[in-house]
Regions:
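C-terminal binding/interaction regions
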Residues: 3, 7-28, 33-41, 46-128
């Protein structure tokens, strides 16, 4: 890894210290799963502010790339995501948020943003 000391890399991969590795835009990938079913609900991005807000409140916050600002999932709909657990990948550049959703997760009203399956070149609905 360019710019990362060997000790930092070893600590990041095998240590116990949380050392989030944000990309060049200051973001981490966050995969949200349902705490009960483990179904994938959505994928979003977190910056340091969103990560801090999530950890402080227990509610999922993300960075809106289109609006360039912090947003709490469900802030207008009431369909918040209560975070039960945060899993960190080996490089500490991606997270899994295990959440209890307070309603549909997708802005379309679907329980999950992953409500279609690719079959050839056609999207087919899946039961979510």
């Amino acid at each position: 890894l360019k710019g990362v000391a060997v000790n930092d890399q070893a600590e990041r991969e095998a240590g116990t210290r949380f050392m989030p590795k944000f990309d060049d835009k200051g973001l981490l990938c966050a995969v949200v799963v349902d705490h009960a079913s483990r179904a994938v609900l959505m994928v979003a991005f977190m910056d340091a502010e969103a990560l801090a807000a999530t950890r402080a409140t227990g509610l999922a916050h993300f960075h809106s790339r289109s609006r360039g600002k912090l947003w709490q999932k469900g802030e207008s709909s009431g369909h918040v995501l209560e975070v039960e657990e945060i899993l960190v990948d080996c490089d500490q550049d991606a997270l899994v948020l295990s959440c209890r959703p307070a309603g549909p997760t997708c802005h379309t009203g679907a329980p999950s943003c992953f409500y279609r399956r690719l079959e050839g070149d056609v999207l087919q609905p899946v039961k979510t």
